[in-house]
Amino acid sequence: MAEEFVQQRLANNKVTIFVKFTCPFCRNALDILNKFSFKRGAYEIVDIKEFKPENELRDYFEQITGGRTVPRIFFGKTSIGGYSDMLEIDNMDALGDILSSIGVLRTC
């Protein structure tokens, strides 16, 4: 069931971030992504509280990404990891270029 829950939310040309809103790392990751202007439908925030039991979901994250923690961030169906991974990309000034290359940003 966790696999279906996650896979239904992942799509090409979309950024998906799985969060827990009480998590400070999740809020920080959302702050980074909120600097960008996404096309409609190209960015989805998924609260992991929507899935029970949460441990099953975290087990599936570990299986497909190597990590159980949130945030879990996907560009298309590819995991880029968590907050520290995205922060590193952002600090290299590469995040905007990556998001542009996958076609999720507004161009105007």
Swiss-Prot record:
GO cellular component, one term: virion component
Domain Glutaredoxin, residue spans: 3-106
Keyword RNA-binding included in the entry's annotation: no
One Pfam family matching this protein: Glutaredoxin
Keyword Transport: yes
Induction, as annotated: Expressed in the intermediate phase of the viral replicative cycle.
GO molecular function: glutathione disulfide oxidoreductase activity
Keywords: Disulfide bond, Electron transport, Redox-active center, Transport, Virion
Localization in the cell: Virion
Primary subcellular site in the record, as a coarse category: virion
Intrachain disulfide bonds: C23-C26
Job description of the protein: Has thioltransferase and dehydroascorbate reductase activities.
Family: Belongs to the glutaredoxin family.
NCBIfam families assigned: GRX_euk
Protein name: Glutaredoxin-1
Organism field: Camelpox virus (strain CMS)
